[in-house]
């Protein structure tokens, strides 16, 4: 099914929602959905028989700084029934970086939303467990934001070259040879 046909089936199955087709460099149809429409669109994507996107395969974000809205949250959905994929993008402004969780619709979103929160600072309202996932609890900031400072908090450990004399080396070789003979 081509991109236009998927967009038409979305508009027919979920009337009243303004889907915006997005350019795609691969074979997956890509549409933008507004942050306000996501709570009503997500269950319809899963439950409507003409769509049946039962699997959330990927959930990630992109920091488009300095552009506004700064972030895009990207969902890749799979319909096994119709044998197709759909990429949903939701624009999220930096000043109000949050959107509703979809973890009750697609349980796979649970840890993926935590990862996006941890690395980009985009909060998911209603998430059952909004703790950090990858970074330590005392970590300040969000490391995948383009304006995140790149800094080293402690000096890196550099191994020093081992200083061995020829006599020590020969003794170790002889010891290893005798040990192998048993």
Regions from the language model: what does each represent?
Residues 1-182:
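Terminal low-complexity/charged segments
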């Amino acid at each position: 099914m081509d991109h236009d046909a998927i967009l038409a089936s979305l508009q027919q199955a979920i009337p009243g929602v303004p889907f915006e087709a997005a350019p795609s460099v691969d074979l997956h149809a890509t549409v933008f959905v507004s942050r306000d429409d996501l709570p009503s669109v997500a269950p319809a994507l899963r439950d409507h028989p003409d769509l049946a996107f039962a699997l959330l395969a990927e959930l990630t974000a992109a920091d488009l700084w300095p552009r506004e809205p700064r972030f895009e949250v990207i969902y890749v959905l799979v319909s096994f029934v119709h044998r197709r994929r759909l990429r949903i993008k939701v624009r999220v402004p930096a000043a109000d970086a949050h959107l509703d969780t979809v973890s009750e619709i697609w349980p796979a979103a649970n840890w993926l939303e935590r990862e996006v929160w941890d690395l980009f600072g985009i909060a998911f309202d209603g998430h059952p467990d909004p703790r950090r996932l990858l970074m330590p609890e005392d970590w300040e900031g969000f490391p995948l934001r383009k304006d995140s400072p790149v800094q080293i908090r402690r000096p890196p450990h550099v191994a020093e070259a081992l200083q061995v004399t020829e006599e020590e080396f020969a003794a170790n070789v002889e010891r290893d040879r005798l040990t192998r003979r048993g």
